[in-house]
Amino acid sequence: MTNMRKTHPLMKIINHSFIDLPAPSNISSWWNFGSLLGMCLMLQIITGLFLAMHYTSDTMTAFSSVTHICRDVNYGWLIRYLHANGASMFFICLFLHVGRGMYYGSYMFMETWNIGIILLFAVMATAFMGYVLPWGQMSFWGATVITNLLSAIPYIGTTLVEWIWGGFSVDKATLTRFFAFHFILPFIITALVIVHLLFLHETGSNNPTGLNSDADKIPFHPYYTIKDILGILLMIMFLMTLVLFFPDLLGDPDNYTPANPLNTPPHIKPEWYFLFAYAILRSIPNKLGGVLALILSILILALLPLLHTSQQRSMIFRPITQTLYWILVANLFILTWIGGQPVEHPFIIIGQLASISYFSIILIMMPISGIIEDKMLKWNS
């Protein structure tokens, strides 16, 4: 068996990726989220496949087909809520994974990091299109509002929006193509994940100290396989608690009303995991400016390797940058809260201040703090 593991063309790849992979001996639980994300992706593809067997992408029957899944299909309610809340778990793990990368300087692996950003955009696009499929009020109006943002693009904007809609409004053509894209994107994401891992295994994993760990490596199996299994069990416990006790906790009640183009919901808002970006979008009075800020709120991650001014990779020994990092985390919570509030005083000004803080911490304060910390180290020596 050992020979086959190391000689068989397919087994050899698996062996080098998950069994005999040299891993740093000191990576903490923050390094568990990669495997949890893989688990989430598998769960979403499997539950999604079973949902697609019963779903119809037609404006007349989409809402009814989701109701039929929940009421008449064996364990349909479980599959549907696993899929809906699985998306929330996916984003929780994604945000923690990206946060880990920012804290420990993993963005210095530029190829891995950039593929990660592409993955983040792909997952966000998939989740957005998935939210449209049940064809409830928030599905319809969310699709209308978000796709309409593209009309802010000069000259080609309006044509582009009508091309995406497949008509002059969000209708049957839009729903059908969103279903098609929502089905195909997870497989594209899976391919990107393989590329992400390929680039990661070229350099090896980072570790909490940010120092080179070549002198102190341990095999991935059994040390990190058992650690990943523990993480997966904890995630399943959390997800099942959510699904079985509070399935609608993270959803919107408006989505239990069938889509009606003649009746606008009082507060149009996306799912919770987009609220921070939605708050940044709304905080700018200009339409094109808002759209650019929305895209930049994620794309700013690509600038992190260029904005890294410190001699140290990780934030573990950098108290000023650490403080700024946790202020940034708190700021993202504030943005998420603001994104779910109506556009009125005092939420408008809070959103604007939080948006300015978000960009200034990343673009200005963190690079300056890196330089200051380096100077402080020189003074002490």
Curated annotation (Swiss-Prot):
Its cofactor is heme b. It comes from the Eukaryota. It is a multi-pass membrane protein. Keywords: Electron transport, Heme, Iron, Membrane, Metal-binding, Mitochondrion, Mitochondrion inner membrane, Respiratory chain, Transmembrane, Transmembrane helix, Transport, Ubiquinone. Heme 1 (or BL or b562) is low-potential and absorbs at about 562 nm, and heme 2 (or BH or b566) is high-potential and absorbs at about 566 nm. The cytochrome bc1 complex contains 11 subunits: 3 respiratory subunits (MT-CYB, CYC1 and UQCRFS1), 2 core proteins (UQCRC1 and UQCRC2) and 6 low-molecular weight proteins (UQCRH/QCR6, UQCRB/QCR7, UQCRQ/QCR8, UQCR10/QCR9, UQCR11/QCR10 and a cleavage product of UQCRFS1). This cytochrome bc1 complex then forms a dimer. It is found in: Mitochondrion inner membrane. This is Cytochrome b. Heme b b562 binds at H83, H182. GO terms for molecular function: metal ion binding; ubiquinol-cytochrome-c reductase activity. PANTHER family: CYTOCHROME B. Component of the ubiquinol-cytochrome c reductase complex (complex III or cytochrome b-c1 complex) that is part of the mitochondrial respiratory chain. The b-c1 complex mediates electron transfer from ubiquinol to cytochrome c. Contributes to the generation of a proton gradient across the mitochondrial membrane that is then used for ATP synthesis. One of its GO terms (biological process) is mitochondrial electron transport, ubiquinol to cytochrome c. The chain crosses the membrane at residues 33-53, 77-98, 113-133, 178-198, 226-246, 288-308, 320-340, 347-367. One of its GO terms (cellular component) is mitochondrial inner membrane. Heme b b566 binds at H97, H196. Signal peptide: none annotated. Binds 2 heme b groups non-covalently. A ubiquinone binds at H201. Belongs to the cytochrome b family.
